[in-house]
């Protein structure tokens, strides 16, 4: 069995006339999602059975279950996870005119729809780093020798960083991105450790001047 990766809107247009419940696999863990599931059930009468786990765990389960899988929909994060699932044939093709009218073409494919987006930002401490310099920073600048031992970032195995590097490769090419990665490593204030929040806290504690982390970690 192949599954659909998309948002809740498509469930109301695709599943409402076929099933009294839908099995939703998700790697997200936010209360706002739960509220959406409740609203969907109230609007359609369709029960949402939620199975939560990290994406790699869900992917492994889907691949092992194959056509016997009970999953109907997957909600996960990051283009890296989407690319992996698409490449491994987990998704079935889907088309929704409703979603097509609401979601820009660069945030959807023949196999999935994007329902949320997040930015990977460069954080700084205004008490120790010039705001004037910071406002003009871009990812490429993180490899500038002037920031030697001033940058913190998660491990390269993290899917958020892998997606960031992929975007740099797409825009700057393999050669320039490889040189950039080496420069970034030279500028690290410490060996990569912890999640995105740990990088922000490192800047707040004065362990580094710059940190790379997703937007939503700032409020945690």
Which functions belong to the PLM regions below?
Residues 1-2:
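Positively charged n-region of N-terminal signal peptides that target proteins for export
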Residues 20-24:
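Cleaved targeting-peptide boundary
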């Amino acid at each position: 069995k192949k599954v659909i990766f998309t948002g809740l809107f498509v469930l109301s247009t695709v599943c409402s006339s076929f099933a009294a419940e839908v099995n939703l696999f998700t790697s997200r863990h936010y209360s706002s999602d739960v509220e959406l599931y409740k609203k969907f059930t109230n609007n359609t009468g369709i029960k949402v059975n939620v199975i939560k786990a990290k994406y790699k765990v869900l992917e492994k389960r889907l691949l092992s279950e194959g056509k016997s899988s009970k999953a109907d929909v997957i909600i996960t994060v990051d283009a890296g996870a989407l690319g992996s699932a698409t490449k491994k044939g987990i998704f079935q093709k889907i088309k929704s005119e409703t979603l097509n009218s609401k979601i820009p073409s660069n945030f959807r494919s023949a196999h999935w729809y994007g329902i949320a987006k997040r930015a990977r930002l460069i954080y700084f401490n205004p008490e120790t780093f010039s705001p004037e310099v910071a406002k003009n920073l871009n990812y490429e600048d993180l490899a500038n020798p002037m920031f030697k031992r001033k940058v913190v970032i998660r491990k390269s195995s993290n899917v958020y960083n892998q997606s960031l590097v992929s975007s740099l490769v797409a825009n700057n090419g393999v050669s320039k991105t490889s040189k950039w990665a080496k420069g970034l490593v030279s500028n690290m204030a410490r060996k990569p450790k912890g999640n995105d929040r740990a990088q922000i806290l490192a800047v707040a504690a004065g362990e580094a001047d710059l940190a790379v982390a997703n937007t939503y970690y700032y409020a945690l």
